Regions:
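Residue-level signal for inorganic ion chemistry
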Residues: 31, 83, 121, 180, ...
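Glycine-rich, highly charged phosphate/nucleotide-binding loops
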Residues: 70-79, 103-108
């Protein structure tokens, strides 16, 4: 998969694009609903003998439109890796700024979708685009001058509630990891890096992933070639995660990412009766 960063409507990536089936969305967490969109695009591309493209945005549109910080379910590298697993040929990352925000819907389609040579577009049922979100799935084909087909993916539900990144963030905030895992289709993961060492405590820093509700969790901790299954203690309000049993492994370097796979919540306890391995996320 080739990742292409498009920072303006004059990007050279438009010149070097290929006719494709294009899946569009922010895809934070690449949850089951997102997976259905991408899988459908891949299937259609195979049937039509076309390339598969995925268009996403950076930063999150809400951070530009509403100037609000959106807690991420996945870092960009995590999202990129998850999308790559579906056999996508091109990941197009559009720099979402005020100029993109203000584009009328038909101009967004012309300047981005058509210039990427989309022959078929796949989106979720609630996809919107263009200034004030006026563009929607009902007018997408018309805005493209009927030059591409459109497939709209209906909502995926969990216990009769729509699976969405917002719903997953809410579930994380409630510590409902089983629900999170069901909606994602995999165990939620966060990434941290070594910040400093204090006696037997290792402190890690990361501000890109959302932490679940404070409490005790069963988890798998990975770094380098090492992996261990343990209980961890999360203090959400301090952005701290305490992990035990690290002393059997070498201390990771400051450049080495520490991955935590969150399996399930054990209790509301955040007290650590041991010398902890601390990850500040």
């Amino acid at each position: 998969m080739k990742t292409c960063f498009i920072d303006s409507k004059d990007s050279h990536h438009f010149v070097h694009s290929f006719p494709c089936v294009l899946a569009i969305g922010f895809f934070d967490g690449v949850h089951r609903g997102h997976q259905k969109v991408i899988q459908t695009a891949v299937k259609i591309a195979q049937e039509k003998n076309l390339k598969v493209g995925v268009m996403t945005f950076s930063p999150h549109p809400r951070e530009v439109i509403g100037k609000e910080k959106v807690e991420r379910l996945s870092t960009f590298s995590q999202k990129e890796a998850l999308i790559r697993e579906f056999g996508v040929d091109y990941l197009y990352v559009v720099a979402f700024n005020r100029n993109v925000q203000r584009l009328p819907p038909e101009l967004f389609v012309k300047d981005y979708i058509l210039r990427l040579q989309a022959k078929h577009v796949v989106v979720g049922f609630d996809f919107t685009y263009g200034a004030f979100g006026k563009g929607n799935v009902h007018r997408l084909r018309e805005d493209g001058g009927y030059s591409f087909d459109v497939t709209v993916i209906d909502k995926i539900e969990h216990s009769k509630l729509k699976v969405s990144s917002t719903f997953i963030r809410k579930s994380l905030g409630e510590g409902k990891l089983e629900r999170v895992t069901s909606c994602l289709g995999y165990h939620y993961k966060t990434i941290g890096f070594l910040h400093y060492i204090d006696e037997s405590k290792l402190v890690f820093n990361n501000h890109q992933n959302m932490l679940p509700k404070s409490g005790e969790y069963e988890a798998i901790v990975k770094y380098g070639d090492y992996s261990f299954h343990t209980n961890i203690y999360c203090e959400n309000f301090l952005n701290n995660v305490y992990v035990s049993h690290f002393h059997f492994f070498p201390v990771p370097s400051k450049e080495e990412p520490i991955e935590i796979q969150w399996l399930h919540r054990i209790s509301a306890n955040t007290l650590q009766p041991f010398e902890p391995f601390i990850v500040n996320l």
